[in-house]
């Protein structure tokens, strides 16, 4: 049995969130009655209103009036008035992943998982399948620049979704094809141990049907180890590793992008097929790797080499993934979602490839628990930055932790040998500090999952106002 079309209003608590809004948008486009609320207004709410969803700002018990089912994310606390009202009225309450799973049952699916790179890789898979005429439905964890949205309803048989592992619910997703980009220590507030994280990814792949397949990056040692533990499922490996089935070869930075070749090796015959002269208009080895994963899936699903090459060359990217927000006196300002040490190091390495000038990193640590559990890694991931400006921790609802704050982080970076580390007293002072550090040809890279994106977009104008 599938989600009946005649079901009454589906209510989303936190409908403006990047994960929730995509599901809501696809449901609206499918003809379901959708309503919801969020704590504050934003771009996603406005987009959903225009599509016909009934959206409220603020959480109130009466918002769930008439709802047949209530959808919540893990960000919603048990004392939320709408969640409490739903339970008092015996309205079914489901997690975001459960509703996503219902949508996935309508199509054949590709699900992209991994600690980092999910959103970009999801966008790349969608772009390639679209170029191949497969017209996929897409539900992503970021705004796809080509769509102006994180979701779209396609007429084809395939759905491409980002599989969020943060609360373990990605194990509920019924996918036919899986990508695993990497597995690092993250979300330990939920999983408790890194071993539990690895077990979850192993189960994610083992949940595939016998006719499906997984595309896994063996450049990452943990993923390579997982490949060796998974039995009875078809695995296609990818990466720069010479043992990979789909190999990234001859990677050359080209200004703001990369040129490379992808080689496919047939395990049975040993024959090699190559797609040469691929041009990706995004810098960074990590983005070329993500593209290789997407290419592996696309070719497996019948997309031609010519369509792949054209789509990669025209790739429009994702909002908040190395996004240029403006310039000032030859200084370029970049906004990036990177908030884990591995992501930060990759972004700064991509920045280093993109300029001969200095790299000024502005970091807003996201969550006290993440900074605490990965403190050593955070203190060593800024090596490609010539200067680091450190803002206060963005709490994301967490309580402060003694000894885990901006000043201790600044001290940690200095203790690990970083020569230029500047604490940011307050956001309005950012432009003045940047003006003193950056000159023409330099890159200012704003990093974090909090409200630093607003600073990144305001910064060029603030710098111009200073002269």
UniProtKB/Swiss-Prot annotation:
Cited Gene3D superfamilies: Mur ligase, C-terminal domain (3.90.190.20), Mur-like, catalytic domain (3.40.1190.10), NAD(P)-binding Rossmann-like Domain (3.40.50.720)
UniProt-listed Enzyme Commission number(s): 6.3.2.8
Involved pathway(s): Cell wall biogenesis; peptidoglycan biosynthesis
Residues at which ATP binds: 114-120
Domain of life: Bacteria
Pfam families reported in the protein's UniProt record: Mur_ligase, Mur_ligase_C, Mur_ligase_M
GO cellular component: cytoplasm
GO molecular function ontology, one term from the record: UDP-N-acetylmuramate-L-alanine ligase activity
UniProt record, GO biological process: cell division; cell wall organization; peptidoglycan biosynthetic process; regulation of cell shape
Enzyme class: ligase
Predominant subcellular localization, coarse grouping: cytoplasm
Keywords, in A-Z order: ATP-binding, Cell cycle, Cell division, Cell shape, Cell wall biogenesis/degradation, Cytoplasm, Ligase, Nucleotide-binding, Peptidoglycan synthesis
Catalytic activity: UDP-N-acetyl-alpha-D-muramate + L-alanine + ATP = UDP-N-acetyl-alpha-D-muramoyl-L-alanine + ADP + phosphate + H(+)
Compartment annotation: Cytoplasm
Family: Belongs to the MurCDEF family.
Known role: Cell wall formation.
Name of protein: UDP-N-acetylmuramate--L-alanine ligase
Gene that this sequence comes from: murC
């Amino acid at each position: 049995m599938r989600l009946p079309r005649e079901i009454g209003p589906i209510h989303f608590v936190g409908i403006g969130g990047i994960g929730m809004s995509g599901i809501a948008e696809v449901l609206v486009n499918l003809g379901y009655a959708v309503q919801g609320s969020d704590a504050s207004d934003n771009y996603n709410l406005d987009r959903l209103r225009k599509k016909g969803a009934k959206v409220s700002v603020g959480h109130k018990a009466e918002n769930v009036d008439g709802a047949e089912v209530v959808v919540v994310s893990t960000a919603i606390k048990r004392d939320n008035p709408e969640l409490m009202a739903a339970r008092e009225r015996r309205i079914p309450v489901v997690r975001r992943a459960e509703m996503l799973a219902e949508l996935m049952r309508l199509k054949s699916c590709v699900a992209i998982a991994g600690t980092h790179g999910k959103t970009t890789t999801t966008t790349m898979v969608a772009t390639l399948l679209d170029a191949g005429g497969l017209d996929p439905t897409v539900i992503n964890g970021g705004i796809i620049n080509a769509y102006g949205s994180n979701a779209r309803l396609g007429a084809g048989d395939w759905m491409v979704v980002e599989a969020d592992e943060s609360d373990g619910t990605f194990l509920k997703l019924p996918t036919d094809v899986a990508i695993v980009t990497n597995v690092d220590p993250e979300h330990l507030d939920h999983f408790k141990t890194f071993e539990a994280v690895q077990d979850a990814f192993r189960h994610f792949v083992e949940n595939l049907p016998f006719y499906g397949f997984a595309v896994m990056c063996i450049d990452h040692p943990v993923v390579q180890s997982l490949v060796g533990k998974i039995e009875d499922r078809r695995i296609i490996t990818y990466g720069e590793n010479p043992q990979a089935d789909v190999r990234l070869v001859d990677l050359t930075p080209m200004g703001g992008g990369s040129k490379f070749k992808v080689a496919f090796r047939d395990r049975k015959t040993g024959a090699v097929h190559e797609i040469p002269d691929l041009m990706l208009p995004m810098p960074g080895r990590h983005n070329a790797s993500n593209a290789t994963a997407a290419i592996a899936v696309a070719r497996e699903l019948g997309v031609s080499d010519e369509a792949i090459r054209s789509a990669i060359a025209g790739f429009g990217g994702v909002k908040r993934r190395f996004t240029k927000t403006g310039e000032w006196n030859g200084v370029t300002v970049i906004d990036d979602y990177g908030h884990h040490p591995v992501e930060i190091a990759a972004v700064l390495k991509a920045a280093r490839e993109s300029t001969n000038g200095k790299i000024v990193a502005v970091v807003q640590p996201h969550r006290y628990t993440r900074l605490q559990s990965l403190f050593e890694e955070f203190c060593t991931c800024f090596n490609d930055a010539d200067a680091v400006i450190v803002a206060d921790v963005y709490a994301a609802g967490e309580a402060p932790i003694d000894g885990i704050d901006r000043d201790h982080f600044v001290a940690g970076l200095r203790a690990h040998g970083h020569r230029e580390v500047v604490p940011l007293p307050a956001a309005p002072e950012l432009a003045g500090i940047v003006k003193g550090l950056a000159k023409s040809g330099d890159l200012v890279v704003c990093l974090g999952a909090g409200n630093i994106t607003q600073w990144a977009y305001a910064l060029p104008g603030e710098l111009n106002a200073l002269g």
